[in-house]
Amino acid sequence: MTQPDPTPPIPIADDVGDPPWRVDGLADSVMILLTMAAVQRIAGFLRAILFCRWLDPEQLGQWDMAFSFLLLAAPLTVLALPGAFGRYVEHFRQRGQLRTFLRSTTLTCIGLLAAGTTVILLGRRWFSGLIFGTPDESGTVALLAVSLVAVVAYNFSIELFTALRNVRLVSVLQLVNSVAFAVIGLGLILGWRASAVSVVIAYGAACLIAALLAGWRLSGTWQSIRPAAEPLAARPFWARFAPFAGWLLMVNMLANLFEVIDRYMIVHYSTMPTSEALAQVGNYHSSRVIPMLMVTVAAMLGSMITPHLSHDWEAGRRREVGHRLALFLKLFGFALVLGSTAVLVASPLLFGWAFRGKFDGGLAVLPWTLTYCSWFAMVMIVQNYLWCAEKAYLCSVALGTGLVVNIGLNLLLLPPLGLLGAVLATTTANLVALGLICLFLARMGFPFDPGVRVVLGLPPVLCLGPWIAMSVLVVVAAEAALGKHLLTPEERDEIAAGARKYLGRLPGFHRVWTA
C-alpha cells in the first residue's frame, strides 16, 4: 500500500502563470544544446588531444586523478543540493516561493563549501596520499582546494539555469568554460611547464570565469522573481527538499565513484610503483578521451530534460513522460553506438599520430571503454524517470550494487590483467547497474518496447570490431525505418515532424518540405 506523504501540501499560487524569464521548450532545448555542445565538444576534444600529446603518461595520469577528486568533492561538499534544482525549482515557482527556495539553498551551500574547503586544506597530506598514492603532492592538493570553490560555483550556476529552462545561457556558460580551459591550459603547458599543476590551475580559472558570468546574469533574473506572498516555513520546506537531495547525493556519489573507482584501484591495489600506476592511469585516460565526451553530452542532455519531464509529471501527464523518454533513449542510444563505431575506425590515426604513439595500452582497451561508457550514458538518461517519480533511492541501489561488483572484480582481475582487468571490471559493473535500473523502471510501468531493448543491447557489438558493428547498425536502422518493431508509426511521425520543423528553417529546405 502506498504510504501517505507526511509533508503538508503547499498551495499553488493562482496567478503564477509563465515565468518572466525566457523559457526554452524541450525540442528547442535539445537543438540548442546539441548545437552549442558540438562547438564545445570540438574545443574539448582538441584540448584533450593536445593534453595527451604534450603531457607524458605519468603527468596525464596525475591530472586524471586530480580531476577525479574534484568530481567527487564538488557535490559532496554541498551535499548535492544544487543537483535537486531540476526537480524542485518549478515546484516552488508554481507556488510563488522560488525566491525563498533559492535564498535558503544558496546560503546553505556557501556554509558547506567553506567547511569542506577548510577540511581539505588542513588535511592536505592525507588527501595527497588518497588521490596520488603519495603524501608528496600536498601543494597540488592545496591548489585543488582553491579550484574546488570555483568548480562548485560553476556547477551551482549550471544546475540553476538548467532548472530555469534557460538552455541558451547554460550552453553559453559551458562553452565559455570549455574554451577558457583550453586556452589557459594550453598556454600554461606551453609557456610555463607541462605538468598536471598547470592543468589544475587552468580548470579552476575556467570555472571561475564562467561562474562570474553566471553571477552577473543571475542578478537580472533575481529581480524578475516576485517575492513570496507568504513566508515558506523552514520545516515543511526541508522536509520535502532534504530527503530527495539526500538520495540524490547518494546517487551522485555512487555515479561519480563509478567514474573514478577503477583508477583509484589501479593506484592503490595494482602492486605497481606509484609512478608506473599513474602512467597506467594516463593510458586509461587516453582511451576515455572520446567516450567521456559522449558521457558528458549524455549528462548534459539528461540534466536538461529533467525540468521538462518534471513539468509534465507535475501536470499529471506521466504516461507521456515514459513515452517521450523511451523515444529519446532509442535515438540517443543508437547515436552513441554509431559514434563509438566511428571512433574505432579512426582509432589508429588518433593513437598513432595525434597521441604520438605514447598510449598503446589505451588503444588496447578502447572497445571495452566505449562499451561501458555507452551503457553509463544510457543510465544518465533513463534515471530521469526515477527522479520524476521521486524514487532516486532506486538509482542508489543499482549504482551501489554495481560499485560493489566493480571493486570485487578489480581485486580479482587487476593484479593478473593490469589495465585490461580494471576495464573489464568496470564494464561488468555498468551492465549490472543498468540492468537493475531497467528492472525498477519496468515495475513502475516504463514502456520497454522492442526498440528500447535493442538499443540497450547494442554496445557489446563494439568489441567485435568496427565493421561488424557497422553492419549490425545498418540492419537496426533499416528495421527502424521500414519495420514495425523498433519504432512505432507514431514515433516515426514525431521524428519526421521534428525534422521538418528544424530543417525547414534552413535556406533551401523550406521549399522542399512544403512542396
Identify the residue ranges that each predicted region occupies.
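Membrane-interface junctions at transmembrane-helix termini in multi-pass inner-membrane proteins
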Residues: 150-174, 367-401, 443
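Membrane-proximal transmembrane or re-entrant/amphipathic helices at the cytosolic face
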Residues: 2-19, 465-515
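Alpha-helical transmembrane segments of polytopic membrane transporters and translocases
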Residues: 49, 61-78, 107, 247, ...
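Helix-loop junctions and terminal segments of transmembrane helices
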Residues: 78-94, 163, 287-329, 383-388
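Signature of the first transmembrane helix
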Residues: 3-13, 22-83, 114-121, 147, ...
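Interfacial segments at transmembrane-helix termini and the short loops linking adjacent helices
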Residues: 26, 124-144, 272, 278, ...
